């Protein structure tokens, strides 16, 4: 059995779990997420805990039970608490402005960048150089943050660009004469 799958997922109060024929549906105050069921993994729901067991002793079934447990754990946390990613813009003239589901970025290019948020992700800009992304799906929030960072990744000489809050950018030394 997978080491990850050995620990059951505790379902907090206010989170509803439904078993369908093809998917596990998790509902909470932040929305609803579904997880497609895999034939190698059996899911048991007892006393507010979700347990994941491999249907057979193959390597793939063990791996899938651990993967399923990790994904469902993130879904339970997402619908109850939500996920947040913070980005900061470092550089002269680098600006961000949120207007509903649209993020306008000025990153030193000759044109502004207009990024439309996907379903389930909301954006806020507390200041012109800070972006806060929130949502219930961890994968989608992380993907959006990575796409925004990719517009102007931090460069190694001055550190200018879009970076995650707390990210350490390894700086290079300038060429010596």
Swiss-Prot record:
> One Gene Ontology cellular component annotation?
cytosolic large ribosomal subunit
What domain of life does the native source organism fall in?
A: Bacteria
What PROSITE patterns does the entry give? RIBOSOMAL_L6_1
* SUPFAM superfamilies attached to this UniProt entry: Ribosomal protein L6 (SSF56053)
Extract one GO molecular function annotation from the record: rRNA binding
The UniProt entry, under InterPro entries, shows:
Ribosomal_uL6-like (IPR000702), Ribosomal_uL6-like_a/b-dom_sf (IPR036789), Ribosomal_uL6_a/b-dom (IPR020040), Ribosomal_uL6_bac-type (IPR019906), Ribosomal_uL6_CS (IPR002358)
Family named by the database record: Belongs to the universal ribosomal protein uL6 family.
Q: How does it assemble?
A: Part of the 50S ribosomal subunit.
Record-given protein name:
Large ribosomal subunit protein uL6
Query: Which source organism?
Result: Neisseria meningitidis serogroup C / serotype 2a (strain ATCC 700532 / DSM 15464 / FAM18)
